[in-house]
Amino acid sequence: MFTLRELPFAKDSMGDFLSPVAFDFHHGKHHQTYVNNLNNLIKGTDFEKSSLFDILTKSSGGVFNNAAQIYNHDFYWDCLSPKATALSDELKGALEKDFGSLEKFKEDFIKSATTLFGSGWNWAAYNLDTQKIEIIQTSNAQTPVTDKKVPLLVVDVWEHAYYIDHKNARPVYLEKFYGHINWHFVSQCYEWAKKEGLGSVDYYINELVHKKA
């Protein structure tokens, strides 16, 4: 059975980006509900003793949706930082190579997240085939992992992620998000992706976030 992971930062540490009340609902209720739903759905099934990575990559329907939403939220929390952090020289070089400049990457990332229709997630992910970083929109619970692409950065654009603090102003939320990216974590993900491929996602989920006894 899975448990809700604690936030990797204090709920009152994000200034005017996200409030403690927003985290109470987003983490304490929405994220918790996905954990509860998954535990109920896998009880008595072949997935009951499976790792979250295995469930994510081998399931479908409601089991997949809830497992993916657990992972997506865990990863999103790790992408956030109370204070600005610096990206590695390696990641900086890759973004400049693949997008032309850091400013162009920001522009493309925010535009993609702004124009995503309905609920979903906006990602930067490492394409193992092309060895390039891509910006990817996914609807609802979908994740690049199922397309064998390694997530590096994500922003949640479900309305429950920003409505409490920013109402329907998604662009305002996204601009503030960009000032709270944990580039140290994103840089680590890029380093892991180049070395271990999808194995880095397996390690992140099963060893760092949801390690089973």
UniProtKB/Swiss-Prot annotation:
Cofactor(s) this protein cannot do without: Fe cation
Binding of Fe cation, residues: H26, H73, D156, H160
Glycosyltransferase found in the keyword field: no
GO molecular function: metal ion binding; superoxide dismutase activity
Keyword list, A-Z: Iron, Metal-binding, Oxidoreductase
Keyword match Cell wall biogenesis/degradation: no
EC number: 1.15.1.1
PROSITE patterns: SOD_MN
Catalyzed reaction equations: 2 superoxide + 2 H(+) = H2O2 + O2
One Pfam family hit: Sod_Fe_N
Cofactor notes: Binds 1 Fe cation per subunit.
Biological process, per Gene Ontology: cellular response to iron ion
Purpose of the protein: Destroys superoxide anion radicals which are normally produced within the cells and which are toxic to biological systems.
The family this protein is said to belong to: Belongs to the iron/manganese superoxide dismutase family.
Record note on quaternary structure: Homodimer.
Full protein name: Superoxide dismutase [Fe]
Biological source species: Helicobacter pylori (strain ATCC 700392 / 26695) (Campylobacter pylori)
